[in-house]
C-alpha cells in the first residue's frame, strides 16, 4: 500500500491499496497509483509518500522505479475537492444496483473546496458549465469477503435522463481475503465532458463479485474535479477495441 502524509499525519482520502500480487500463473508484478488534492497546506509543510506491507505474506516485494508529481493548485483555479466516508444508503459499498433504490449507492461528499464552476449538495456535484472536467476519485475498501470486487462508476446527468459517463468506470477493487488481504481500493482518473450546463455528477460503488460487507474501514474516499480548457493544449480519446 502507499499513503500520503503531511507533517507526519495521514491525509484523508490519500491512500492506494490495489497492488495485489497473487504469485501464481506468472502474476508476480503489480503497482499502486494515487492522484489527489492535498488541501490546506502551509508554507514549509513536509509531504511524504509511504509504502508499507498490507498483508501477512512473507514473500519479499522489491520496488522498481517509482514516480511522484506535485503541483501547487492556486486559489484562482476552478476546482472541487472533497472526502466521503459512506454512501447515501450507509457504509456498505458492496451492493448490486438491483438491490437498492436509485441513488443509494452514491458517495456523500464533504467539500473542502468548491470553485465557481461547481454546485454541491450531499452526493450531488453540479457541473455548471458545458465542457470538459478532469476527475480524480480514490475509494479505500475493507472487508473479510473471499474474492470480493467492488467497482466504481460516474453517473452524469441524473438517474432518469442521464447515463454512465464515457469511460467513467473503475474496477480494480479486488479483495482476496487470504493471508490478511482484506483491504483494497478503487481509483479513477479521467476526463468527462458535459453536453449542457448544470449537469449533475454522482460517484457510485457497486458489487462486481462475491457478496459480503465491504466498507471504507477507518479511511476516507476523496474526489478532485477541475474545469479544463478543452480548446487548446489538450488531447483526449476513447477506445473500444485493441
Where are these regions (language model features)?
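Extracellular beta-strand-rich recognition modules
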Residues: 1, 32-36, 44-53, 131-141, ...
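Terminal (often C-terminal
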Residues: 1, 56-148, 172, 213-242
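Short, surface-exposed beta-strand/strand-loop-strand elements in extracellular ectodomains
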Residues: 1-10, 147-160
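Glycine-biased low-complexity/repetitive sequence motifs
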Residues: 6, 12, 41-46, 126-127, ...
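Acidic glycine-/aspartate-rich tracts in secreted/extracellular proteins
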Residues: 10, 53-56, 208-210, 231
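Glycine-rich strand-loop-strand elements at beta-sheet edges
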Residues: 12-42, 118, 156, 161-196
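Exposed beta-sheet edge/beta-hairpin loop segments within beta-rich domains
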Residues: 36-42, 60, 124-126, 190-196, ...
Amino acid at each position: 500500500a502507499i499513503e500520503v502524509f503531511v507533517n507526519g499525519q495521514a491525509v484523508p482520502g490519500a491512500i492506494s491499496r490495489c497492488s495485489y500480487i497473487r504469485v501464481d500463473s506468472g502474476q508476480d508484478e503489480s503497482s499502486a497509483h494515487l492522484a489527489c488534492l492535498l488541501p490546506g497546506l502551509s508554507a514549509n509543510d513536509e509531504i511524504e509518500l509511504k509504502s508499507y506491507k498490507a498483508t501477512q505474506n512473507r514473500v519479499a516485494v522489491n520496488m522498481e522505479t517509482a514516480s511522484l508529481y506535485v503541483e501547487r493548485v492556486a486559489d484562482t483555479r476552478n476546482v472541487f475537492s472533497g472526502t466521503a466516508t459512506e454512501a447515501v444508503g450507509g457504509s456498505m459499498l458492496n451492493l448490486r444496483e438491483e438491490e437498492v433504490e436509485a441513488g443509494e449507492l452514491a458517495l456523500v461528499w464533504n467539500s473542502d473546496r468548491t470553485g465557481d464552476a461547481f454546485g454541491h449538495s450531499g452526493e450531488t456535484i453540479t457541473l455548471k458549465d458545458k465542457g470538459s472536467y478532469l476527475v480524480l476519485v480514490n475509494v479505500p475498501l475493507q472487508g473479510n469477503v473471499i474474492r470480493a470486487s467492488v467497482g466504481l462508476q460516474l453517473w452524469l446527468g441524473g438517474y432518469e435522463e442521464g447515463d454512465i459517463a464515457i469511460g467513467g468506470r473503475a474496477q480494480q477493487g479486488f479483495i482476496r481475503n487470504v493471508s490478511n488481504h482484506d483491504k483494497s481500493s478503487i481509483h479513477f482518473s479521467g476526463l468527462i465532458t458535459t453536453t449542457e450546463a448544470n449537469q449533475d455528477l454522482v460517484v457510485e460503488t457497486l458489487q462486481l463479485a462475491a457478496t459480503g460487507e465491504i466498507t471504507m474501514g477507518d479511511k476516507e474516499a476523496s474526489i478532485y474535479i477541475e474545469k479544463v480548457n478543452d480548446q487548446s493544449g489538450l488531447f483526449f480519446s476513447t477506445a473500444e477495441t485493441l
